[in-house]
């Protein structure tokens, strides 16, 4: 066992054979759209209202009480239940006014967010907090029941919590929705994409711009290679009518802002919603989003050629991808409310977390994040939870 209780395989790897749902953190103000570990002991999540909360994960958690009802999923199986009582959030990061599209962490200290309010913002966990504020974590549920009195549902008591507020330490102002955000493996460089087709490389620590170029559609999914020489950018126009739609996926020379490989024909009519480079730079994973089959492809970044396609698919589309810190495994999730762990070397499915809930509007998982040591995984659930699993413990 390591310090977090996860079983270590020979050579220091994490075992995925046994997984445990530790916590399901409730937060139902609006769709939870982004999630990130901030170091090993904190988790941050953002929602469609532009709110961001931070939880401190207890070292000695309290066991969860036995539920009065034995709720089953839509498939008839018993729902997986967390073994510990959920801690309450301790901080609210204030300043955003629109959807939080991405969250990431640098140096186990800095939380960085991208929003439809045209800004990137940085928060320092070591900074002092401000005034207290009161939140109702189940506000959306209460409001929905009040609006639909004919449903006969009984309104739950408000789940009130007091948090300390904290403004951003740094704000980078853009001009359009910032829909894409990713960070290089060495944490030195950010890549962003907006809905005007602007792609930008930034010095992560300073927040200063290094390079910018233009693509045709929304710069939707973006990623930068570990050597900082290549960038993946997927484009789309999310219009209703087929005649107005545009999709593209290209590999760019990050220094010159010129196309190295245009993969648009290979992935014709696919909205690539997620992308990630492996830590060694030898594999690029991309996932098809939208409402189609959520296919995942592993590519050779040097040639742009497809190495393999992973199966099974995420029904109704992929929403996020991330490599495990060991570089040997990939996590994926989508609108089917399932997280899958894959062996990158052979493309085989290693583990599946969560259960399908019956359709693409049955509480997607929007985003996933590994803890720095790779012993835990978090998923942002549209239903109003942040789920945290432990591997091996």
Enumerate the predicted regions with their spans.
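WD40-repeat beta-propeller superdomains and closely related acidic/aromatic-rich repeat-like regions
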Residues: 2-393
């Amino acid at each position: 066992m390591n310090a977090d209780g996860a079983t270590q395989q020979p050579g220091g790897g994490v075992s995925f054979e046994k997984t445990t749902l530790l916590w399901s953190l409730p937060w139902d103000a609006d769709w939870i759209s982004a999630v990130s570990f901030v170091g090993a002991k904190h988790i941050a999540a953002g929602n469609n209202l532009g709110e961001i909360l931070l939880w401190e994960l207890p070292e000695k958690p309290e066991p969860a009480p036995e539920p009065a009802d034995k709720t089953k999923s839509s498939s008839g199986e018993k729902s997986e239940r967390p073994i510990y009582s959920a801690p309450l959030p301790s901080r609210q990061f204030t300043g955003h006014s629109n959807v939080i599209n991405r969250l990431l962490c640098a140096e186990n200290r800095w939380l960085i967010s991208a929003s439809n309010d045209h800004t990137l913002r940085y928060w320092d966990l070591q900074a002092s907090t401000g005034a207290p504020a009161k939140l109702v974590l189940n506000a959306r549920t209460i409001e929905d029941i009040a609006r639909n009195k004919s449903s006969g549902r009984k309104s739950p008591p408000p789940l009130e919590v007091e948090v300390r507020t904290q403004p951003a330490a740094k704000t980078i102002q853009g001009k359009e929705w910032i829909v894409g955000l990713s960070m290089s493996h060495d944490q030195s460089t950010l890549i962003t994409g907006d809905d005007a087709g602007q792609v930008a490389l930034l010095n992560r620590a300073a927040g200063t711009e290094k390079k910018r170029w233009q693509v045709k559609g929304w710069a939707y999914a973006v990623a930068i290679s570990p050597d900082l020489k290549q960038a993946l950018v997927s484009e789309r126009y999310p219009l209703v009518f087929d005649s107005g739609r545009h999709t593209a996926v290209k590999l760019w020379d990050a220094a010159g802002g010129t196309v190295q490989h245009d993969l648009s024909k290979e992935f014709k009519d696919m909205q690539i919603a997620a992308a990630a480079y492996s830590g060694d730079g030898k594999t690029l994973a991309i996932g098809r989003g939208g409402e189609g089959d959520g296919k995942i492809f592993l590519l050779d970044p040097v040639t742009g050629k497809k190495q393999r396609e992973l199966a099974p698919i995420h029904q109704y589309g992929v929403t996020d991808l991330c490599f495990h810190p060991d570089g040997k495994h990939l996590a994926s999730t989508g609108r089917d409310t399932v997280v899958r762990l894959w062996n990158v070397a052979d493309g085989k499915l290693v583990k599946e977390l969560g259960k399908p809930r019956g359709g693409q509007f049955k509480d997607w998982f929007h985003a996933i994040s590994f803890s720095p040591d790779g012993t835990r995984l978090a998923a942002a659930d549209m239903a109003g939870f942040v789920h945290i699993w432990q591997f091996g413990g």
